[in-house]
A protein has these predicted regions:
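Structural detector for short beta-strands of small beta-barrel domains
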Residues: 1-16, 61, 617-618
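Short aromatic-glycine-enriched beta-strand elements
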Residues: 13-26, 624-632
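Long, highly charged, low-complexity intrinsically disordered interaction regions
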Residues: 15, 24-215
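Interdomain "pre-motor" coupling segment immediately N-terminal to P-loop NTPase/helicase cores
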Residues: 66-68, 246-307
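N-terminal pre-P-loop "Q-motif" helix
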Residues: 321-337
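Conserved helicase motor core of SF1/SF2 NTP-dependent helicases
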Residues: 342, 353, 357, 361, ...
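Conserved helicase motor core of P-loop NTPases
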Residues: 351, 370, 460-599, 604-607
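C-terminal accessory regions
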Residues: 613-624, 628-730
Length: 730
């Protein structure tokens, strides 16, 4: 049967059934009909067990063509290709380390000089001239590159033979220097901070005489980490870990698991508290958060006469032409009087109004001016869009937490820490429900003990993506000044959205939710008609002069007919139809087009773009008149140029997930509510989606699905210890 051989470049999609979609760079084939793909990337689909990015595979199957996706290779059988010395040397010669050596040249070198070609070239550079089609200029360039990397090339090739890519091998050598190869051979799990754990596990299992106990120990730690990501808990019980080992690593019937846990505890890798089992790092973070917050909260506010606040609030009301109600005045005053305060409320309750009042009063009390205010006050939020809203509301500078802490993407660490702290006096953090244990810990490390902290958020929104329930635990501890806002202050008397959000939160939906309002409508259609109905609504909006900047579709899941991916494919052709004047580029399974609305998926502080930022593709351009293309994206005035590799972290944004929308607001929101979403349609998710709408909200789907979701408490419970630690370290 025909086959293709090559390196897996990326896994685009992976289902629980082990069905995968990926991209293979084709290096070899025995099928003449596939020779046109040699040296090119080809999409493949099929059912796979373990499939590692960067590894080489032989795949059997047949080429198919789909109008929507183009050519794909439908895989019926596959096997991993063992890395030989021959292939490892070629990989090294064709890497970015060696100048002037393409794949054809590399093969001729190894075919002529053998697997020890590098050694021979280092001993006698003239030997390169025995290679067919070799020029003196090219030989000198290759020799110079080899010699400049002579200290690492042997280890690079040996690490490549073990299964690491050249880039991975370089990272290992840079981190562990002369011990790199020894560590990789004896305990590759020590590389887990820089290399994917599953790849390390496969490399260890394929080595000589793997130690089962060493593997189980490391798999236990990785299982707990994966459970933290999946469940959001900060601790687990033994049976949960046992089940996780089976799920993630097919490790079953470990009769000595208790001994492994005890050993990991002795090594301070995990922490046990009765039946609770934590990663030691997570446990320590909860403890340190509790200690620091309690210490800060114990310090008095000094330097100003607090009794003057009431008078200053009255002056501010007169200046701004507003009247704060009792609830708002209490929140403003108490936040200025206490070291740590928590202000929570749903949409329309005036959280932003209160932040503006607090910053204005603080500047007045401490005689601050716009020129020096940033030295005294820091306004922060978890996302770029939320920090921008904060800045617009207060007319002051605001920042993401990652930018404030000077996060280094390459090193994956914050430059601001306990040894290099920021020295503002007041810090106000919005959208606190999005902050997980890890981020809160690092934020507090970067703050002095004399800081004044005001935490603002909506306790009924989705919890953080990372583990923990920081906001809820702080409130439940009853140790800090807590100001809940219940009264809705929405400018329009006919505004229904905040009232609907409140009904969803309280699970007390009235029949009024079926009636059309000035800012709300429930379009009742069957699941099979949801996509068509949303498309029709958007078509009508376009005819009325609206653009994709005015409308945001929010959905809970990516796959399926009513999932985000399918919604994006349909909506893009409405808002940004194909045109000969609009250049396109296909990356993975997504075709990007000039003018497309796109979403950034990861933080990139050096470029000033962050997870959740929305931008528009400005242009797709050739780099230095080559075939290499870059994509220029305008993120609200910040024009960023991304390589095709970096575009893996970008998605179409005509429809986005409700999780990604958290921390943002949109003028008009359309939200499908389908029974096909099943468990992923739950109370906090619906509440969060509804509360993203500023001017209008349209729900599209069935009443049954909506009510089912409102009454579904999925995701509300997480096992955390921050509250316990707060009470312990008062």
């Amino acid at each position: 049967m025909g086959y293709i051989r090559g390196k897996v470049r990326v896994i685009i999609y992976e289902a629980e059934s082990n069905y995968k979609v990926g991209v293979l760079k084709v290096k070899e084939t025995n099928d003449k009909g596939l020779e046109e793909f040699l040296g090119k990337s080809l999409h493949f689909t099929g059912y796979f067990g373990t499939l590692q990015v960067g590894d080489n595979y032989e795949m059997e199957g047949n080429l198919i063509y789909k109008e929507k996706y183009g050519y794909q290779y439908n895989v019926t059988d596959y096997k991993k290709m063992e890395v030989t010395g021959y292939e490892a040397v070629i990989e090294f010669l064709t890497s970015d380390l060696i100048k002037g050596c393409g794949e054809a040249t590399a093969k001729r070198i190894v075919d002529t000089l053998g697997n020890d070609a590098i050694k021979k070239i280092k001993e006698d550079k003239s030997i390169l001239m025995t290679v067919p089609k070799m020029s003196e200029k090219k030989a000198l360039k290759i020799y110079s590159s080899i010699m400049s990397n002579s200290s690492v090339d042997d280890d690079l090739i040996k690490l490549k033979e073990m299964g690491f890519s050249i880039n991975e091998a370089l990272n290992i050598i840079n981190k562990f220097q002369k011990n790199a190869l020894s560590i990789a051979k004896t305990n590759p799990y020590a590389l887990k901070e820089i290399i994917d754990f599953k790849k390390l596990d496969n490399i260890y299992l394929s080595g000589e005489n793997p130690d089962e106990t060493l593997r189980v120990k490391n798999c236990v730690l990785e299982t707990i980490r994966l459970l933290e990501i999946r469940n959001g808990d900060t601790y687990f019980y033994l049976e949960e870990i046992r089940d996780g080992l089976k799920t993630y690593f097919n490790i079953v019937d470990v009769d000595y698991l208790e001994e492994v846990i005890n050993s990991l505890e002795s090594n301070k890798d995990i922490y046990r508290e009765e039946k609770r089992i934590y990663l030691n790092s997570t446990y320590s973070m909860e403890v340190e958060i509790a200690k620091k917050l309690n210490y800060i909260n114990s310090l008095p506010i000094t330097g100003k006469n607090i009794s003057m606040i009431d008078t200053e609030i009255e002056k501010l009301e007169e200046k701004l032409g507003v009247t704060y109600d009792t609830e708002q005045k209490t929140a403003i005053k108490r936040s200025l009087e206490n070291r740590i305060s928590i202000i929570t409320g749903g949409p329309g309750t005036g959280k932003t109004t209160i932040i503006k009042a607090i910053t204005s009063l603080y500047m007045k009390m401490y005689n601050l001016s716009p020129s020096n205010v940033n030295s005294y006050i820091a306004l922060l939020a978890p996302t770029g869009r939320a920090s921008k809203r904060l800045s617009e509301a207060t007319n002051l500078g605001a920042s993401t937490i990652h930018k404030y802490l000077k996060w280094n993407k390459d090193m994956n660490e914050f430059q601001v820490d306990e040894f290099n702290q920021n020295y503002q006096r007041l810090i106000i953090i919005d959208e606190v429900s999005m902050i997980d244990t890890n981020l809160m810990y690092h934020l507090l490390l970067g703050l002095t003990n004399t800081i004044q902290i005001i935490l603002v958020g909506d306790k009924d929104q989705l919890p953080s993506v990372g583990c923990g329930l920081v906001l809820k635990d702080l409130i439940d501890s009853d140790l800090f000044n807590f100001c809940p806002l219940e009264t809705i202050h929405r400018q329009s008397e006919n505004s229904y959205i905040p009232y609907l959000a409140k009904e969803i939160k309280n699970k007390d939906i009235t029949s009024d939710f079926l009636s059309k309002k000035d800012d709300y409508n429930f379009l009742r259609v069957d699941n099979s008609k949801v996509l068509e109905s949303i498309s029709r609504v958007c078509e009508l909006s376009i005819k009325r002069g609206h653009t994709d900047k005015d409308i945001q579709v929010l959905a809970p899941i990516y796959k399926g007919i009513n999932g985000i991916d399918n919604l994006n494919n349909h909506l893009r052709d409405l808002f940004n139809p194909k045109s000969d004047k609009k250049r396109e580029i296909k990356i993975g399974d997504i075709t990007f087009r000039v003018g497309d609305k796109v979403l950034q998926l990861v933080n990139d502080p050096e470029r000033g773009i962050y997870n959740g930022d929305i931008g528009y593709i400005d242009s797709i351009v050739s780099v230095n008149n080559t075939k290499t293309l870059n994509v220029n994206i305008d993120f609200d005035g910040n024009l960023v140029s991304l390589t095709t590799g970096e575009m893996i972290n970008v998605r179409l944004a005509y429809a986005i997930s409700i999780h990604k929308a958290q921390g943002s607001e949109f003028v008009n929101v359309i939200m499908p509510v389908c029974s096909s979403y099943y468990k992923m349609l739950y109370n906090k998710l619906i509440y969060t989606g509804v509360s993203r709408a500023k001017k209008s909200l349209m729900l599209v789907g069935t009443v049954e699905a909506f009510l089912m979701g409102v009454n579904n408490n999925y995701s509300m419970d997480r096992k955390t210890s921050l509250k316990d630690q707060l009470l312990k370290y008062i």
